[in-house]
Amino acid sequence: MPTITSYFGFLLAASTITPALLMGLSKIRLI
């Protein structure tokens, strides 16, 4: 079970961090 929980947590973190990085890159490109 811990492995599934950690995997789900990693997936959730990736789904929240990826959009933030894309937004940062788009802002840098606009500037």
Swiss-Prot record:
Pfam families: PetL (PF05115)
InterPro entries per record: Cyt_b6/f_cplx_su6
Keyword Lipid metabolism: no
Subcellular location(s) of the protein: Plastid, Chloroplast thylakoid membrane
GO MF annotation list: electron transporter, transferring electrons within cytochrome b6/f complex of photosystem II activity
Single Gene Ontology BP annotation: photosynthesis
Ranges annotated as spanning the membrane: 4-26
UniProt keyword Membrane, yes or no: yes
Gene Ontology cellular-component annotations: chloroplast thylakoid membrane; cytochrome b6f complex
Keywords per UniProt: Chloroplast, Electron transport, Membrane, Photosynthesis, Plastid, Thylakoid, Transmembrane, Transmembrane helix, Transport
Membrane topology recorded in Swiss-Prot or TrEMBL: Single-pass membrane protein
Function per UniProt: Component of the cytochrome b6-f complex, which mediates electron transfer between photosystem II (PSII) and photosystem I (PSI), cyclic electron flow around PSI, and state transitions. PetL is important for photoautotrophic growth as well as for electron transfer efficiency and stability of the cytochrome b6-f complex.
Subunit structure comment from the entry: The 4 large subunits of the cytochrome b6-f complex are cytochrome b6, subunit IV (17 kDa polypeptide, PetD), cytochrome f and the Rieske protein, while the 4 small subunits are PetG, PetL, PetM and PetN. The complex functions as a dimer.
Entry similarity comment: Belongs to the PetL family.
Name recorded for this polypeptide: Cytochrome b6-f complex subunit 6
Organism, as annotated: Drimys granadensis
Name of the gene this protein is made from: petL
